[in-house]
């Protein structure tokens, strides 16, 4: 055998998506990317993601809690949807789980204050952010206010062209030498100074007893539009997020740039794949979880018992006894994907990447056999038999993928929800597209990876 043939036969070489797909698939790729950009531009909170999913599911004939083709929503921040397969549920399920929360700024319980005739909203950051990312850029307000009379008032300000936007002011470089420039990057912007500028005109009238007239003007405006008072902030979920639409990035339009791609890119692709799979062999279950970015705490997260309730209901409605034995027997036959993004190699920061093992943008869905950090702490590690089965099916269906880790061993790491689901006994692996600028207000994904993630999920749900 010639050396060239030997090399081709025995060595591994990653494949670029655009070098492997034909014009028909490139057209489909662009269509999916356009749909994704529209989704990403309007869906910026967990509640908005659930609302989007519910609308799409009902349009496709899914009914709440229907046994054969149904969905379940909990607290408006968790969504599950399923369709029964040809094989009985005792043969196991095909599960894809992603998370729909994203790093952001939450308003504090008592957020509104006035200082030097300017009105601000105080925030508390949610999830892992670099605080300097959030200053000096246009911001929008998304969320809901729960009134004592039971009404839920939805608020979105800063997304329409006619809307005002908000911002967090930065300090000019002329005055920033001691307070910012001489400090570590992580200390230059402190959390308590992530105050959002919201108003600067005093309320009309000259009553000297009223001291905070700009704050009162803000309250007057928000009361006229939404009927809420200052006390209503206590029972509100109001988030500060980047304003504006997702965009194509690059002169060749090869990337999608926008907020919240970790992990709504996996939510979007898994839901789209799920809706397109007809008559699956195994029961398909898609889960959209909350609170992953803060350790999966709370009753809408992967640590909650809500997943067990869904499985027990499926068991019961299948005519089986809803016993722990049946539950765990089904789990041991279940195959799952923890659909989450990973860090793509950024050539500007090669000192933290392992070039041989980390994911490259444009080379397909990234499969992380294990997560965690250091000595694989806090990690799930997929069994190789399951990984080989999955990759064989992807090969047969021409899915372009790469198997990767995330960064050099001692540089850090990350976790996903897979370890919580692995505890039930199912086979599960992490897979999703690599991103640049992850956890920033403007994350970057490659269209080729977006498309291959959708294709990989669709293949998995079929087999």
For each predicted feature, which ranges?
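N-terminal hydrophobic/helix-forming segments and targeting peptides
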Residues: 1-463
């Amino acid at each position: 055998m010639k050396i060239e043939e030997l090399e081709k036969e025995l060595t591994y070489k990653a494949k670029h998506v655009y070098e492997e797909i034909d014009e028909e698939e490139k057209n489909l790729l662009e269509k999916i990317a356009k749909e994704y950009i529209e989704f990403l531009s309007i869906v910026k909170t967990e509640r908005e993601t659930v609302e989007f999913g519910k609308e799409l599911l009902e349009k496709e004939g899914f009914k709440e809690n229907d046994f054969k083709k149904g969905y379940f929503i909990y607290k408006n921040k968790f969504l599950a949807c399923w369709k029964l397969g040809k094989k009985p549920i005792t043969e196991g399920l095909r599960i894809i789980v992603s998370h729909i929360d994203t790093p952001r700024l939450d308003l504090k319980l008592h957020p509104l204050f006035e200082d030097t005739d300017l009105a601000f909203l105080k925030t508390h950051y949610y999830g892992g952010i670099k605080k300097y990312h959030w200053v000096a850029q246009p911001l929008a307000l998304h969320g809901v206010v729960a009134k004592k009379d039971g009404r839920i008032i939805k608020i979105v300000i800063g997304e329409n062209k006619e809307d005002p936007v908000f911002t967090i002011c930065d300090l000019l470089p002329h005055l920033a030498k001691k307070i910012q420039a001489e400090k570590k990057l992580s200390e230059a912007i402190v959390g308590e100074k992530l105050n959002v500028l919201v108003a600067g005109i005093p309320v009309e009238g000259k009553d000297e007893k009223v001291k905070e007239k700009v704050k009162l003007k803000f309250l007057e405006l928000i009361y006229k539009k939404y009927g809420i008072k200052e006390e209503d902030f206590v029972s509100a979920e109001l988030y500060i997020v980047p304003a504006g639409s997702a965009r194509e990035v690059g002169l060749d339009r090869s990337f999608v740039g926008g907020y919240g791609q970790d992990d709504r890119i996996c939510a979007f692709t898994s839901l789209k794949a799920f809706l397109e799979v007809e008559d699956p062999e195994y029961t398909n279950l898609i889960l959209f979880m909350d609170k992953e970015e803060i350790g999966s705490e709370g009753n809408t997260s992967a640590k909650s018992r809500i997943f067990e309730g869904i499985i027990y209901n499926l068991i019961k409605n299948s005519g089986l006894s809803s016993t722990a034995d049946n539950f765990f027997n089904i789990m041991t036959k279940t195959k799952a994907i923890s659909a989450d993004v990973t860090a793509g190699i950024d050539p500007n920061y090669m000192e933290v990447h392992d070039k041989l093992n980390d994911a490259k943008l444009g080379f397909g869905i990234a499969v992380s056999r294990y997560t965690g950090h250091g000595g694989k702490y806090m990690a799930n590690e997929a069994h190789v038999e399951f990984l080989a089965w999955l990759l064989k099916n992807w090969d047969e269906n021409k899915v372009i993928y790469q198997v990767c880790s995330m960064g050099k061993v001692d540089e850090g790491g990350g976790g996903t929800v897979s370890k919580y689901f692995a505890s039930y006994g199912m086979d599960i692996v992490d897979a999703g597209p690599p991103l640049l600028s992850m956890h920033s207000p403007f994350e970057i994904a490659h269209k080729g990876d977006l498309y291959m993630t959708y294709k990989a999920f669709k293949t998995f749900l079929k087999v």
